[in-house]
């Protein structure tokens, strides 16, 4: 298993994690591990639409032409 050292973590963040861990009956280390695991799992389940939207935002947005027809006069024969 890998080990990670986090330097310069604010006291407020450390206290918040300790409080969250204590409330869940876990150690601070176990709580941090759970938080990181949840983030890693969420990253793996990114959907295509979300990924494309993120790319669009990174490049400043994209204007797409509306290509749907506006004519509603055609009857549909089933």
From Swiss-Prot:
- Gene Ontology biological-process annotations: migration in host; regulation of DNA-templated transcription
Q: What happens when the gene is disrupted?
A: Disruption of the fitAB operon leads to faster transepithelial cell trafficking of the bacterium; mutants adhere to and invade cells normally. Mutants grow normally in liquid culture but much faster within human cell lines A431 and T84; these latter 2 phenotypes were observed using MS11A bacteria with a disrupted fitAB locus.
What are the GO MF terms of this UniProt record? Answer: protein homodimerization activity; sequence-specific DNA binding
Superkingdom of source? Bacteria
Give any Pfam family that matches.
FitA-like_RHH
Q: Which UniProt keywords apply?
A: DNA-binding, Toxin-antitoxin system
**Classification via InterPro entries:** Arc_rbn_hlx_hlx (IPR013321), FitA-like_RHH (IPR053853), Ribbon_hlx_hlx (IPR010985)
Q: How does it assemble?
A: Homodimer in the absence of FitB; forms a heterodimer with FitB; 4 FitAB heterodimers form a complex that binds to fitAB promoter DNA. The complex is also seen in solution.
Function field = Antitoxin component of a type II toxin-antitoxin (TA) system. Plays a role in the speed with which bacteria traverse human epithelial cells; disruption of the locus increases the speed of trafficking about 2-4-fold. Binds to its own promoter, binding affinity of the FitAB complex is 20-30-fold higher than FitA alone. No nuclease activity was observed for the FitAB complex, perhaps because FitA (the antitoxin) prevents metal binding and thus catalysis by FitB.
Q: What is this protein called?
A: Antitoxin FitA
Provenance organism: Neisseria gonorrhoeae (strain ATCC 700825 / FA 1090)
